[in-house]
Amino acid sequence: MSYNILIVDDSKTIRFVIKKTLDIADVPVGDLYEVENGKEVLDVMNSNWIDLIFADINMPVMTGIEMIKKMSEDNTLDKTPVIIVSTEGSKTRIDDLLELGVRAYLRKPINPEELRNIVKEVMGDYNEC
């Protein structure tokens, strides 16, 4: 089984690093989409099936937190898990994100083994639904 993945980060370099890390971690990727902010996520999701989202917190137009809140209101978070990938990450901030419905948090720089384990855990949870 492969996953349609959406990477959300305003840095083209970070999006590239996440793509390469997915490859190094042997995550089975189907279609791969990239956008620069949370608003674009909503647009992509309206016309494509997305299995998993990797998102930054600090982005222009619509931040990762605003995106999560909007997805929660629309009940899309129930169907599409979000993994936050950020350098930001106090315990309080991470707990707040998890309460909003984020499934996991990865700190930059990303460790391929940690990414693989989190994807397996998160997607295993969703595949059982």
Predicted features along the sequence, with ranges:
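C-terminal output helix
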Residues: 110-119
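Short amphipathic alpha-helix used as the core "switch/output" element in two-component signaling
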Residues: 43, 65-78
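Alpha4 helix (beta4-alpha4-beta5 surface) of REC/receiver domains from two-component response regulators
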Residues: 66, 89-104, 117
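Helix N-cap/capping motif at the beta->alpha junctions
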Residues: 34-43, 64
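Receiver (REC) domain active-site loop signature in two-component systems and cognate sites
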Residues: 59
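Active-site beta3 strand of CheY-like receiver
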Residues: 48-54
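Two-component/phosphorelay signaling modules centered on CheY-like receiver
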Residues: 12-33, 100
